[in-house]
Amino acid sequence: TPPGRFILFDSLRDKDTIRVLREAKEPVVSALDELKDKGIRSIRDFYADPARLELAQGLDEFRRKKLMASCDNYAILREALWMLYARPFDPVRFGQLISAHHANLRDGLGISTPEIEQILQTAMANGAYGGKVNGSGGGGCCYVYCATEDAEKILRAVEAQGYPGHILKGDKGNCVEA
């Protein structure tokens, strides 16, 4: 568990999960299918050989934008995963990665909402390192990552705008101890 806290917020906006996921996924799957004859089987192929991203230039703008956002999010995921095991841990960079992931979801895949953006902007203005939509997007929840000492202030600022939140406490979970 990284140091600091995660705060989960509810945007109080209903969403159509199946529609949101379909609209984000189908163009990426279609783009990958079109690139199959060029040796592309998955997003991981672009991560393994970034020069292959040039192949996306032959796609229409709509699918290219969604594919590129998905490729970038995979690279962000890999860096963030590596950071969780790195010492010393850099909470500021970790927050930046979370926000960069959200930017791809918002700008590339179109799955944020004005409510989610308001929550994230308020949290960032009050000290959060980063934040993103949670789950399928299109409404629902988001979370932010922050220093432990800033969590209550961030929670109060966002709740003052009418969005309930909950500070999450990390735990190592179930494990086998020798």
Residue spans of the language-model regions?
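C-terminal nucleotide
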Residues: 1-130, 144-178
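N-terminal pre-core extensions flanking Radical SAM catalytic domains
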Residues: 138-144
